[in-house]
UniProtKB/Swiss-Prot annotation:
GO terms for cellular component: extracellular space; Golgi membrane. Residues 37-865 are lumenal. Catalyzes the first step in the biosynthesis of chondroitin sulfate, heparan sulfate and dermatan sulfate proteoglycans, such as DCN. Transfers D-xylose from UDP-D-xylose to specific serine residues of the core protein. This is Xylosyltransferase 2. Widely expressed. Expressed at higher level in kidney and pancreas. It comes from Homo sapiens. Residues 53-65 have a biased composition (Basic and acidic residues). Monomer. The gene is XYLT2.
Length: 865
């Protein structure tokens, strides 16, 4: 009793302290519970992370040719932004989100969060269907945790035919944009839940066990030995997309022989390339274009359907008696001659050549997503849940580039064997089906002993650069892509340990020199004086496509380029600046090309119909606009700076480490990226500062650069619209300048392909609300950076928001002329202007001779090259 009384007395005396302690314990428990929930959620959403998972030992060097990466994310929650640095083979540099402002102006009002775009809204769970609409109507920044670009729902009242319970399927339904796609997803899921979609077991006919991988050796002397029977004839299946017609012609020129056959499928979205390929095929009886076209997305089931349909076509073309089927893309190129390839295949005319993933089947199944159900619609590959691999068979796979015998192709296309029929059903709902279907059919068929674990190619894999989840906007998975070959990779092209006859990838916009080296190695040099060997042109716009394929930024830039060029012609010294050389543009440009020389971007070539100011017929001119460099390296002379370059642009390709938006044309609604390239040296921490045209410090952040770091890049989440005009990005160390560059946010003369209206200009060209680009204010850095007083610049910026019509065009032209210069003009047809050279006689025009990419007649030896 005494002890009880003491306890009660103590409780009464310290009841306030006890209550406080209990409250603190309760609060801590809630916090721990909350964070544990977050960790569990993140564990299931690893695909959202920007940084790729650590590679297994040897994975970076093993050439498995499989492009699957790891599980992607369907995007449950928007993640915080983070910076990245890249440096292959060494620990990456860290980008630190460090607020370097010294004070915050109390008068500034923090902006509301930017609205979520239709393609990036979080529509899973309770938020489904509650799309936020932005007042300005422009998209926000991409979210690392979402399937960027995946279409979003337009009809949230869709009701499936069964109760769908899987989180992957529910997420796909919430994100699909069309009712047809939602219906397809629901039908597939309902059939799968009922157990009637996937085969439970598949018959296996192969009597062998283990991997069928007979080694085949090859040396150059075998090409000279007599063949067993007549030389084989090859059906080349070329699967192409994009706009690189000149590189495709160069490939065709290298592999062409009159004894072979060429069947070309052009992606349904590549109309310009299709027109060019159809014209190309008219000159050769053994070159045909598929009369049908499909949209073949990366990882999609459509690619396998395209191959199977093409195989049927090739089997049924009268007179095309081919022995082998070889698929190629426009980024492939031969590494040995046609004679060597024919000799090799003639000695192995009963073999099928496919590259396998290796020995660890269970790991391959997980990595490839074969145990997941996928469906393709709305040009997206949706992950819908888990599934079981059919019993009774060995699942294999690796590369979707192969060399197959005609007999095996006939078996796959025409057989009613349950093995093929049921595997077709299984692979209809499979990610990357072409990387596994033919392997699995062959390895379980009676022809399993014909499999050779070699697809006769060498692929330039660098998984630390190529596995960046770059396809998550079209597939709910993380995938990999091989790197482009460069001259330093040439030794890899000379494989001696195994027979290889093709290599990939090559891109002339990235590096053309390696193609020159390889072409010389195979066929010798072109005659002395051959033009354009170091030049490359690629079309970016053609009038036949219409302006719908152009962004407002590109439409603004191309029309401004034409005006600048015509103004240059009219104001130049005689003989250019005569009345006969004064023109007015007629309509929109008819075509635009990228121009490269010696693997350096040289600018845009704009073809424009014009009307002479003097009396005369209409003419067509081509104009060359060249970018002007604005980089300043400002490191102290007594301290060698590691900084090599500082660039700002959009469409950064982390795999090839370049901006795909050549020339850096960007507008108020774009999301620019700052990229720094470094030489090796001591660790350093640098500060990056972005300054807008009115001297507003838009953002500042620190980057830590390790000793071996080569590239750092970061896209700050700036509020938009960005203020048009010249921006400055400074790089400092201890507030001492290392480098500085300028870039242009282009004032738009078009909005939604129509001339800009005043009510649109008033917000589109005004910068972000309250001049706040970030939640933090960095204006306190103005004095440290010695920025000018902003009043005059602010007044000019305010006037610019009211401009439309010719006044707006004049402002756009002035700004553009500070970053671009007219490098040349030429006439496509006859012109009275005495100083206009015919385009065909120039070295830079897209109409000038380009022998390396011109096909011409078949030579006496049956070849084009």
């Amino acid at each position: 009793m005494v002890a009880s009384a003491r306890v009660q007395k103590l409780v009464r005396r310290y009841k306030l302290a006890i209550a406080t302690a209990l409250a603190i314990l309760l609060l801590q428990g809630l916090v721990v519970w909350s964070f544990s929930g977050l960790e569990e959620d993140e564990a299931g959403e690893k695909g959202r992370q920007r940084k790729p998972r650590p590679l297994d030992p040897g994975e970076g060097s093993k050439d498995t040719d499989s492009s699957a990466g790891r599980r992607g994310s369907t995007g449950r929650r928007h993640g915080r932004w983070r910076g990245r640095a890249e440096s292959p083979g060494v620990p990456v540099a860290k980008v630190v989100r460090a607020v370097t402002s010294r004070q915050r102006a109390s008068r500034r009002v923090p902006p509301a969060p930017p609205p979520e775009a239709p393609g990036r809204q979080n529509l899973s769970g309770a938020a489904a269907g509650e799309a936020l609409v932005g007042a300005a109507g422009f998209p926000p920044h991409g979210d690392t945790g979402s399937v960027e670009g995946a279409p979003q729902p337009t009809d949230n009242g869709f009701t499936p035919k069964c109760e769908i319970v899987g989180k992957d399927a529910l997420s796909a339904l919430a994100r699909a944009s069309t009712k047809q796609c939602q219906q397809e997803i629901a039908n597939v899921v309902c059939l799968h839940q009922a157990g009637s979609l996937m085969p439970k077991a598949v018959p296996r006919h192969c009597q062998l066990t283990g991997k069928m991988s007979p080694g085949i050796q090859w040396d150059e002397s075998q090409a000279q030995q007599p063949m067993d029977g007549p030389p084989v004839r090859i059906a080349y299946m070329l699967v192409v997309h994009g706009r690189a017609i000149r590189q495709l012609k160069r490939l065709l020129k290298a592999v062409y022989h009159e004894q072979h056959f060429f069947y070309i499928h052009v992606d349904k979205r590549s109309d310009y390339l299709h027109r060019e390929v159809v014209e190309l095929a008219q000159g050769y009886d053994n070159v045909r274009v598929t009369p049908w076209r499909m949209v073949t997305i990366w990882g999609g089931a459509s690619l396998l359907r395209m191959y199977l349909r093409s195989m049927r076509d090739l089997l049924e073309v009268p007179g095309w008696a081919w022995d082998f089927f070889i698929n190629l893309s426009a980024t492939d190129y031969p590494t040995r001659t046609n004679e060597e390839l024919v000799a090799f295949l003639s000695k192995n005319r009963d073999k099928n050549f496919l590259k396998s993933h290796g020995r660890d089947n269970s790991r391959f199944i997980k990595k490839q997503g074969l145990d997941r159900l996928f469906h393709e619609c709305d040009s997206h590959m949706w992950r819908l849940g888990e599934r079981q691999i059919p019993a009774g068979i060995v699942v294999d796979g690796g590369s979707d580039w192969f060399v197959l015998t005609r007999s095996f192709v006939e078996y796959v296309v025409y057989t009613d064997d349950p093995l093929v029929a049921q595997l077709r059903q299984f692979y209809t709902y499979t990610l990357l089906p072409a990387e596994s279907f033919f392997h699995t059919v062959l390895e379980n068929s009676l022809a399993c002993e014909t499999l050779v674990d070699n697809n006769l190619r060498v692929t330039n894999w660098n998984r630390k650069l190529g596995c960046k989840c770059q396809y998550k906007h079209i597939v709910d998975w993380c995938g990999c892509s091989p790197n482009d070959f460069k001259p330093q990779d040439f030794l890899r092209l000379q494989q001696v340990s195994r027979p290889t006859f093709f290599a990939r990838k090559f891109e002339s916009t990235v590096n053309q020199e390696v193609l020159e080296i390889l072409d010389f190695h195979l066929y010798g040099s072109y005659p002395p004086g051959t033009p354009a060997l170091k030049a490359y042109w690629e079309n970016t716009y053609d009038a036949a496509d219409g302006p719908s394929g152009l962004s407002d930024v590109m439409l603004t830039a191309y029309t401004a380029f034409a005006r600048l060029s015509l103004h240059h012609a009219a104001t130049a010294a005689p003989p250019m600046g005569t009345p006969l050389c004064r023109f007015e543009p007629r309509g929109l440009p008819s075509s635009v090309h990228l121009y490269f020389y010696d693997d350096h971007f040289q600018g845009y070539l704009v073809t424009q119909a014009v009307q002479p100011s003097a009396q005369g017929p209409a003419e067509t001119l081509e104009m060359w606009l060249m970018p002007q460099g604005s980089l300043k390296l400002l490191g102290r002379s007594d301290q060698a700076s590691r900084l090599q370059s500082l660039e700002v642009g959009t469409d950064w390709d982390p795999k090839e480490r370049l901006f795909r938006n050549f020339g850096g044309l960007l507008g108020p609604l774009d999301e620019p990226v700052a990229v720094q390239r470094w030489a090796r040296g001591p660790n350093l921490t640098a500060t990056v500062v972005w300054i807008d045209p009115t001297y507003v410090v838009a953002t500042s952040y620190d980057i830590t650069v390790d000793t071996e770091t080569e590239v750092t890049q970061y896209k700050p989440p700036l509020s938009r619209p960005l203020r048009p005009g010249p921006w400055t990005v400074r790089l400092l160390q201890f507030w001492e300048p290392l480098g500085e560059t300028r870039f242009l946010v282009l004032p738009l003369t078009f909005n939604r392909k129509l001339p800009l209206r005043k009510d649109d200009a008033s917000w589109l060209h005004a910068g972000p609300p309250h001049n706040e680009y970030m939640e933090q204010s960095f204006q306190g850095l103005s004095s440290i950076l010695n920025l000018p007083q902003p009043e005059l610049a602010e007044e000019a910026a305010q006037r610019h928001t009211q401009l439309t019509g010719p006044a707006l065009e004049a402002w756009t032209d002035r700004e553009l002329s500070s970053f671009w210069s007219v490098a040349g003009l030429c006439a496509i047809g006859p012109s009275p202007c005495p100083s206009l050279e015919p385009c065909r006689l120039t070295s830079w025009s897209s109409l000038s001779p380009d022998p390396k990419s011109e096909l011409g007649p078949v030579k006496a030896d049956g070849r084009l090259r």
